[in-house]
Regions:
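Alpha/beta-hydrolase superfamily serine-hydrolase fold, recognizing
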Residues: 47-201
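A glycine/proline-hinged amphipathic helix-loop "lid/cap" segment
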Residues: 1-66
Length: 201
């Protein structure tokens, strides 16, 4: 493992007991602050334009130096319980800046206030919105981290169920795909994960 990776893991491990003890409200606030910081880091490189849906909000994050056509539909992480539009914009700003392509990020509705299938419904509405904007499925890339990584797979299954054309590709960043917590990896990596515990998941 490279030195910088070891440093990151050690820092995350330090915060692990604190994160596990945070309330939902505190976790949400912390994630929002992280998003604001990420957006600030890229403020000279991107333009941000909010977009309102009936039940949720989204935003366009556009690189000033656009190098590619198409769009990334980014679904944020947060265990389906955390992640506001500010957090989504932060991660989207990083994607837009690094990839040189437009990113659309919905702040899908969260549990426990809005249980399943609210998040999936909002993800589907966001995909349909991009189609209405004139993007072809072959021009749309789905990306998501953690819970958002799992949600992009759920969205593709829903599109397949509806007989809709699938996007050109998927980028799952540490996707959460086992909501039952019954996989061997939960037990085998219990002490290895630098920031999460099975109980927190």
């Amino acid at each position: 493992m490279e030195l910088h990776a070891k440093l990151v893991r050690s820092q995350l491990s330090f915060f692990k007991p604190f994160v596990a003890g945070l309330s939902l409200e505190a976790t949400r606030k912390g994630q929002d602050k992280l998003g604001e910081l990420m957006t600030a880091l890229h403020r000279r490189e991107v333009l941000v334009r909010d977009h309102d849906f009936e039940h949720f909000q989204g935003a366009w994050v556009m690189p000033k130096d656009q190098r590619r056509t198409g769009v990334i539909l980014y679904l944020h992480g947060g265990g389906y319980t955390c992640g506001s539009l500010e957090y989504a914009k932060g991660f989207a700003a990083t994607l837009a800046s690094e990839c040189g392509v437009r990113v659309f990020c919905p702040a899908y509705r969260l549990a426990p206030e809005h249980p399943y299938p609210a998040a999936l419904d909002d993800a589907l509405e966001s995909y349909q919105y991009l189609l209405q904007k004139g993007y072809e499925p072959g021009q749309i890339m789905l990306a998501g981290e953690s819970a958002g990584g799992g949600l992009i797979y759920c969205l593709c299954l829903k599109l397949k169920e509806l007989g809709m054309e699938l996007p050109c590709g998927l980028i799952g960043i540490s996707p959460r795909t086992d909501l039952t917590g019954s996989g061997d990896s939960y037990r085998e990596n219990r002490e290895n994960d630098p920031s999460m515990t099975p109980e927190l998941l």
